[in-house]
């Protein structure tokens, strides 16, 4: 690992910096994108690296690894034939409530599982917003720390979650809605 070079990558990394990071790849070296949590390039700044690499016509090879999106669908008991991942929902309360109601409508209208994530320190607020804005009979799966020690994956109705919110601050979570 000492022979490796690591570059910082976050929402503040400029396209110019990313292009510079890709110079070894342009020169024929192999490179990889890793993520501290989640799947690189899916709701992740790694997508910017891949987009620039594609524009430069560089070879991009995705590697198989655990994906909280697929694993949470598998463990939820929800529709795995039709699902949609929405990444991060709006932070502003009114916009978030509107988005949650829209996703819930899609559950019932399209028979489609709806998935989304939140920054770990806002997990509790997300759960509160789901419980406040979704129908009591709508099912919510909370999948946290997937593939890690302390993994937590449970599916209950919104009504059954009320009064039983787990402590999930600072833990990566994915939330799924279904009927």
Tell where the protein language model's regions lie, with residue ranges:
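Short, hinge-like loop/turn segments at secondary-structure boundaries
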Residues: 1, 50-51, 76-81, 133-134, ...
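Class I S-adenosyl-L-methionine
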Residues: 1-59
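Gly/Ser/Thr-rich loops at beta-strand to alpha-helix junctions
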Residues: 38-41, 68, 121-122
């Amino acid at each position: 690992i000492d022979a490796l070079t690591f570059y910082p990558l976050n929402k503040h990394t400029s396209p110019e910096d990313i292009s510079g990071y890709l110079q070894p790849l342009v020169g024929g070296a192999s490179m990889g994108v890793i993520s501290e949590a989640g799947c690189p390039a899916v709701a992740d700044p790694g997508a910017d690296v891949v987009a620039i690499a594609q524009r430069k016509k560089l070879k991009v090879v995705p590697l198989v690894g655990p994906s909280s999106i697929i694993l949470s669908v598998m463990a939820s008991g929800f529709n795995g034939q039709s699902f949609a991942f929405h990444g991060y929902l709006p932070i502003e309360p009114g916009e978030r409530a509107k988005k949650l109601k829209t996703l819930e409508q899609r559950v019932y209208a399209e028979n489609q599982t709806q998935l989304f994530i939140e920054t770990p320190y806002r997990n509790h607020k997300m759960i509160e917003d789901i419980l406040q804005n979704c129908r009591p009979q709508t099912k919510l799966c909370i999948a946290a720390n997937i593939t890690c020690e302390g993994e937590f994956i449970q599916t209950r109705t919104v009504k059954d979650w009320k009064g039983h919110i787990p402590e999930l601050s600072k833990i990566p979570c994915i939330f799924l809605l279904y009927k």
